[in-house]
Swiss-Prot record:
It holds the Pfam family UreD. InterPro entries: UreD. It comes from Halalkalibacterium halodurans (strain ATCC BAA-125 / DSM 18197 / FERM 7344 / JCM 9153 / C-125) (Bacillus halodurans). Keywords: Chaperone, Cytoplasm, Nickel insertion. It is found in: Cytoplasm. This is Urease accessory protein UreD. The lineage of its organism: Bacteria, Bacillati, Bacillota, Bacilli, Bacillales. The gene is ureD. UreD, UreF and UreG form a complex that acts as a GTP-hydrolysis-dependent molecular chaperone, activating the urease apoprotein by helping to assemble the nickel containing metallocenter of UreC. The UreE protein probably delivers the nickel. Belongs to the UreD family. GO terms for molecular function: nickel cation binding. Required for maturation of urease via the functional incorporation of the urease nickel metallocenter.
Length: 271
């Protein structure tokens, strides 16, 4: 485990620029500071789509560690971003010290970015601060999702972390339309009404497309988990937010992945 007080702090950075050139989306600039890096571009679709894996080689973040990810998707480019693994947040090495992650993503006119959902696993005594900012053009296509777990449940760690503080901001045509903060502290009894209402897993998705409507979402989610709770909000024209509460990690993960696949197919193939 990297939580030893003798280990150096890691400050990973990943800067990626994608552009459409000669009819193909290309990764035209990449700056990587370990432990963050990116895979080579993969192409598995008939449509123009550049797929990359976002890699974190240290196995997790420790208090005092920081991660900064900045991704630019230029006009007409199409990108799929797949985290290689869950974000594991190790225990704080000293009181009041947190690990941090900052994400910035810009999706320009007619461009598309699909960020596949992955889990955040806060270990016992972990403190995690996350800030995520998206800049979208009204003609762009975008998907982002994640799942917060109660901890390492197979090690009998449920809600033993110090805090998870996550802020999402979304700008649509340079106007701030979303400022959404989720700040969870287990000492505040997360499973009471107004927190997690007795559930252990929390999932969230943000998605945008020019012709996206609530009716599309209702069709994709008509067979939602019987024992889960979910709701959606049409935040702005073409921008929808979905939240889940679940007692099953595999069921919530399946729901997130099913929605991701449905939206991706809709956006790329019009199906």
């Amino acid at each position: 485990m990297r939580a030893s007080s003798h280990l150096p702090q890691l400050h990973g950075r990943l800067d990626l620029t994608f552009e459409r050139r000669r009819g193909t989306t290309r990764l035209v600039a990449s700056e990587q500071t370990p432990p963050l890096n990116v895979s080579r571009v993969l192409r598995t679709e008939e449509v123009d789509l550049a797929t990359v894996y976002l890699v974190e080689t240290s196995g997790g973040v420790v208090s005092g560690d920081s991660q900064t990810i900045a991704i630019y998707v230029g006009e007409g480019a199409r990108v799929e971003l797949i985290p290689q693994s869950a974000t594991k947040v190790y225990p704080s090495r000293k009181q009041g010290e947190s690990s941090t992650q900052q994400v910035w993503l810009r999706v320009d006119e007619g461009a598309a970015a699909f960020w596949k959902p992955e889990s955040i696993i806060p270990f016992r005594k972990a403190s995690f601060l996350q800030s995520t900012r998206f800049h979208l053009h009204s003609s762009s296509t975008f998907f982002y999702g994640d799942m917060l777990t109660p901890g390492r449940v197979h090690h009998n760690e449920r809600f033993q972390y110090e805090q998870v503080d996550s802020l999402v901001e979304i700008y649509l045509d340079e106007t701030l339309v979303v400022h959404d903060r989720v700040h969870l502290q287990p000492k505040d009894q997360l499973q009471t009404i107004g927190r997690l209402d007795g559930y252990s897993y929390y999932g969230a998705v943000w998605m945008h497309a020019p012709i996206l409507k609530g009716a599309h979402l209702e069709q994709w989610m008509e067979n939602g988990g019987q024992n889960d709770r979910f709701a959606y909000t049409c935040v702005a024209e073409g921008l929808i937010h979905v939240r889940w509460l679940s007692e099953s990690s595999w069921r919530l993960r399946a729901a997130l992945n099913d929605l991701y696949t449905a939206f991706r197919t809709f956006a790329l193939k019009g199906e």
